[in-house]
């Protein structure tokens, strides 16, 4: 019985819960912020009959409208965006100047439904373009893109205008760039061409909150056909010149290297020549000394033999004098052996000396 009652009460509880949550969900959907939404590219894209109403997503508390206007000496145009924004309510106005190109930017955010239609997107706070017929051309010619689409502002398709000086400014340069506006998660961009003051600016620009005006300048008739991928140098700065590689410095370097190599190699060559010479001298000196000893020994022995075999008196005295001198002053080969024996002793001694010399020569 209790189980049956529980089974009956469970669907009732689910139904009651959904009935309580449904008003809350409907109330939250009804409280979603509503904003106007449109995009204007130098046209009437944000005119009243072309604007739409959108409901913003969760967490979006403000509606946004932003407009950026650009003025050249030949005209002006504007880009604008309306939609659901982000941030806090408020207003921001800013005026910009890029080498004689004037720009005006306005941003407004509000937190009420359909509150983002307060800015005038057609009448801007810019100085009206001057009467071209009242000014005398200064000789410069440029392509002009004022509110033209990107398809109509390519290469030499835009109209050509004559530059003139206005408001005390000299306009003799040509400009090629873009204006970009980002607001309400939408980005709008249009090309900008015309006459400017600077003739040599390179990728210069001015910015505001979500707004950018940037481009490059050049000098010469109709030089602003396409400056996106080109770089122009100021005439006051000398251009970069690539010098050819040196051709005369290399041989002199080789000559210096060869001379230094020769000078360092000379001592090594001399040393290698001197060392064998020293070794040869030390190697051959024993043989020369042996020959000198043999010659001196032979001369001494011949003198002694003459003393014994000669007449009495002078021959014997000469023989004794030679032997005494040999004992006092030994020869170069070492101590001399006095000859005391006869011819047999002399022969055996000479044989021993000859055998020693032959053995040394063979070794």
Swiss-Prot record:
A lipid is attached at residue 343 (GPI-anchor amidated serine). InterPro entries: LY6_UPA_recep-like, Snake_toxin-like_sf. Keywords: Cell membrane, Glycoprotein, GPI-anchor, Lipoprotein, Membrane, Repeat, Signal. CDD domains: TFP_LU_ECD_LYPD3_rpt1, TFP_LU_ECD_LYPD3_rpt2. SUPFAM superfamilies: Snake toxin-like. Binds laminin-1 and laminin-5. Interacts with LGALS3. Interacts with AGR2 and AGR3. This is Ly6/PLAUR domain-containing protein 3. It comes from Mus musculus. The lineage of its organism: Eukaryota, Metazoa, Chordata, Craniata, Vertebrata.
């Amino acid at each position: 019985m209790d189980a049956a009652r529980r089974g009956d009460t469970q669907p009732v509880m689910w139904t009651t819960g959904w009935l309580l949550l449904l008003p809350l969900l409907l109330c939250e959907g009804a409280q979603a912020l509503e904003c106007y939404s449109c995009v204007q590219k130098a046209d009437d894209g944000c005119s009243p009959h072309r604007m739409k109403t959108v409901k913003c997503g969760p967490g979006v508390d403000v509606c946004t409208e932003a407009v950026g206007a650009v003025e050249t000496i030949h005209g002006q145009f504007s880009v604008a965006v309306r939609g659901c924004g982000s941030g806090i309510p408020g207003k921001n106005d800013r005026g910009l100047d890029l080498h004689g190109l004037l720009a005006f930017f306005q941003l407004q955010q509000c937190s009420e439904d359909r509150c983002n239609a307060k800015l005038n997107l057609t009448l801007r706070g810019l100085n009206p373009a001057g009467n071209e017929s009242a000014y005398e051309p200064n000789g410069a010619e440029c392509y002009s893109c004022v509110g033209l689409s990107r398809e109509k502002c390519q290469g030499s398709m835009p109209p050509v205008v004559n530059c003139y000086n206005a408001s005390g400014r000299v306009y003799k340069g040509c400009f090629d760039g873009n204006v970009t506006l980002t607001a309400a998660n939408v980005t709008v961009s249009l090309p900008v061409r015309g006459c400017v003051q600077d003739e040599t600016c390179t990728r210069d620009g001015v910015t505001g909150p979500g707004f950018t005006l940037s481009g490059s300048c050049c000098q010469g008739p109709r030089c602003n056909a396409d400056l996106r991928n080109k770089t122009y140098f100021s005439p006051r700065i000398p251009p970069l010149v690539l010098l050819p590689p040196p051709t005369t410095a290399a041989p002199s370097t080789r000559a210096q290297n060869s001379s230094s190599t020769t000078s360092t190699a000379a001592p090594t060559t001399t040393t290698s020549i001197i060392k064998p010479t020293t070794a040869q001298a030390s190697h051959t000196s024993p043989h020369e000394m042996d020959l000198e000893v043999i010659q001196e020994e032979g001369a001494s022995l011949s003198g002694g033999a003459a003393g014994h075999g000669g007449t009495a008196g002078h021959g014997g005295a000469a023989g004794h004098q030679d032997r005494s001198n040999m004992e006092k002053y030994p020869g170069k080969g070492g101590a001399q052996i006095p000859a005391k024996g006869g011819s047999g002793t002399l022969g055996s001694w000479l044989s021993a000396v000859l055998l020693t010399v032959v053995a040394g020569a063979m070794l």
